[in-house]
Amino acid sequence: GKSVCFQVPAMMREGIAIVVTPLIALMKDQVQNLNDRGIRALCVNAGMNRREVDVALNNAAYGDFKFLYVSPERLGTRLFQSYLQEMNVSFIVVDEAHCISQWGYDFRPDYLQIGKLRSLVDAPVIALTATATPKVADDIMERLGFEQRNLIKSGFERPNLSYIVRKCEDKLGKLLSVCDSVPGTGIVYVRSRKKTEELSAFLTSNGISSSFYHAGLGTDSRTD
């Protein structure tokens, strides 16, 4: 739903929209979805070598593309900024904008530098998130130079989703029961990297197709 808020306006304007997003998987998924619809989009991520990055940025600057997805760490590089001057930027988009406040002060400080793009590019800026508290929203606006009148909020109720808390003694047994009774694919969130691997092994040993994902995986594994 958030993507429509910037993809449709960007399609109506000349130039290319720069979309800042935190995760390679999310980046690739959105680029693939756009390309599948005949909308030219590309991305630059940490899994690419310098030659691939150079080609992608050259295409963004001189080719007929509508969207360029990048991580916040890419914005401050010399190579990116040299090509940025050649781009006809239609929008600057900060997707998952809560990361500015929640990640920027700790392990991804480049999130705090996104606002500097406004002095380099004369283009509208939009920041989107579905998980901002009032404090986080204020921090986002301060970091990006937004005024209070530019803040648009909507309700969080989603009639197609439900949150249910069930207390149980045998959590693993309950998980197996859910896997057996509920059709489709599910996601299980746990507290540690080690636990993701242990739980995946447990499910696999019980005949349930499973894999695990965490930040400690290599680029190839995370992409697959």
Where are these regions (language model features)?
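Walker A/P-loop
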Residues: G1-V8, A17-T21
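Helicase motor core with emphasis on the C-terminal RecA-like subdomain
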Residues: P9-R13, K28-D224
